[in-house]
From Swiss-Prot:
Domain Response regulatory: residue ranges: 10-124
Sigma-54 factor interaction domain sequence ranges: 147-376
Keywords: Activator, Alginate biosynthesis, ATP-binding, DNA-binding, Nucleotide-binding, Phosphoprotein, Transcription, Transcription regulation, Two-component regulatory system
Pfam families in alphabetical order: HTH_8 (PF02954), Response_reg (PF00072), Sigma54_activat (PF00158)
Signal sequence annotation: none
Annotated region of DNA binding: 425-444
UniProt cross-references to InterPro entries, sorted A to Z: AAA+_ATPase, CheY-like_superfamily, Homeodomain-like_sf, HTH_Fis, P-loop_NTPase, Sig_transdc_resp-reg_receiver, Sigma_54_int, Sigma_54_int_dom_ATP-bd_1
Gene: algB
Species the sequence originates in: Pseudomonas putida (strain ATCC 47054 / DSM 6125 / CFBP 8728 / NCIMB 11950 / KT2440)
The protein's name: Alginate biosynthesis transcriptional regulatory protein AlgB
Length: 448
């Protein structure tokens, strides 16, 4: 089957009047379009089997053939093709029926060359926009970093995720920091029937209860100090789509009843506004915390947990996905050498062995950071162990069996692991329980 041209649309004309076909063809070919003609439904069907068309002008009166039946067959045979109905004044009602059946527009005979050219340009522009949208949706559905896996454990998780994505069930994603929980959430949205709507993310640890309520549900002007203008809130932004609650274990306990009510009833009020609103939102949540333990300690509501974990997905850590380590490393390297215009083209055997032997406490995020650094500092085609910044005993890896480590060595390993698993220095300092200035001194001390 031939491919449609990229720059000039391929057009099919279907009419049982040869004079109409000839006039339309000359007009469109003068504009540079590639045009094929058919004087019957059978001829049109044959052409559609052999070629790809972007646009069809279809006469509703095709001798003994019913134009609506031909349209229905075209929608099956070439669903991407735009179809414009050509009709007489007396059949406008039928043309309206055709639009309801899937036609893009209609022209009334006799039509001028300008009308034909305008209709063609309009429909081909829509076709190009549709093709771009399909390409973007294809990108959304492509496996992201860490989701294109050869690990049986990870493949099982992804299979379940694809199966439940088409439902509206709430999903709780569990896994260590850096395992790709956010990427999986966005992939689930992309695989779902809500993919054309927004996927809105809230990072729960970043907001206190008051700010979280405003961020989630919105507020009116003057609702609190500093509220100089009204905001819609993330729930409203996600209407028809997906709301992803990242690190749900840090969601303020005092606000959990309002979140529970929204999940149950799809109803909420903006801060400072008594009007009850509704939003159709699918909830995805993720955490690296043990929510069941938090429930036992009265730090998380049990009823909210039950609402969130209709489906639970457990992402395995990278150390349990050894099949994926080198694949991911190669992919990251290819990306970063292109981004930074660096010479590296692969890893030495020693570097590959080191990558496989490392425990990756920071998981995929840490691997990405290590490879990015290596791609920048490596001056040659092969990345060596020295470029990885790992050495024989990488910071944060498990202690060597039988080796006695000093307190300084243990501290260096621990700080290195936390740094690798953190997006920012402030986040790492918070995890370590020290201030940023202390962390800065420790990094200098241990050359991290």
């Amino acid at each position: 089957m031939e491919s449609a041209q990229d720059n000039q649309g391929r057009i099919l004309l279907v009419d049982d009047e040869s004079a109409i076909l000839r006039t339309f063809r000359y007009c469109l070919e003068d504009e540079g379009y590639s045009v094929a003609t058919a004087n019957s439904a059978a001829q049109a069907e044959t052409l559609l089997q052999r070629q790809v068309f972007d646009l069809c002008f279809l006469d509703l009166r095709l001798g003994e053939d019913n134009g609506l039946d031909v349209l229905a067959q075209m929608r099956i045979q070439a669903p991407w093709m735009r179809v414009v109905i050509v009709t007489a004044h007396s059949a406008i009602d039928t043309a309206v029926d055709a639009i309801q059946a899937g036609a893009a527009d209609y022209l009334v005979k006799p039509c001028s060359p300008d009308q034909l050219r305008l209709a063609t340009a309009k429909q081909l522009e829509v076709r190009q926009l549709s093709a771009r949208l399909e390409a973007l949706e294809g990108e959304i559905r492509k496996p992201k970093d860490g989701l294109d896996s050869h690990s049986p454990a990870m493949m099982a998780v992804l299979e379940t995720a694809r199966q439940v994505a088409i439902t509206d069930a709430n999903i709780l994603i569990l896994g260590e920091s850096g395992t790709g929980k956010g990427e999986l959430a966005r992939a689930i949205h992309g695989w779902s029937k809500r993919a054309r709507k927004a996927c809105v993310t809230i990072n729960c640890p970043s907001l206190n209860a008051e700010l979280m309520e405003s961020e989630l549900f919105g507020h009116t002007r003057g609702a609190f100090t500093g509220a100089s203008e009204s905001t819609l809130g993330r729930v409203s932004q996600a209407d028809g789509g997906t709301l992803f609650l990242d690190e749900i274990g840090d969601f303020p306990l005092t606000l959990q009843p309002k979140l529970l009510r929204f999940i149950q009833d799809k109803e909420y009020e903006r801060v400072g506004d008594p009007v009850t609103r509704r939003a159709d939102v699918r909830i995805l949540a993720a955490t690296n915390l043990n929510l069941e333990e938090m429930v036992r300690e009265s730090r998380f509501r049990e009823d909210l947990l039950y609402r969130l974990n209709v489906i639970t997905l457990h992402l395995p850590p990278l150390r349990e996905r050894s099949e994926d380590i080198l694949i991911l490393a190669d992919r990251f390297l290819a990306r970063f050498v292109k981004e930074y215009s660096r010479p590296a083209r692969g890893f030495s055997d020693e570097a590959r062995t080191a990558l496989l032997n490392y425990r990756w406490p920071g998981n995929i995020r840490e691997l990405r950071n290590v490879v990015e650094r290596a791609s920048i500092i490596c001056p040659q085609e092969r990345v060596e162990i020295s470029h990885l910044g790992m050495g024989e005993q990488p910071a944060g890896s498990a202690p060597r069996v039988g080796a006695a480590l000093s307190l300084d060595e243990l501290e260096r390993a621990h700080i290195g692991a936390v740094l690798a698993a953190s997006d920012t220095l402030d986040q790492a300092a918070k995890t370590l329980g020290i201030d940023a200035s202390t962390l800065y001194r420790k990094r200098k001390q241990y050359n991290l």
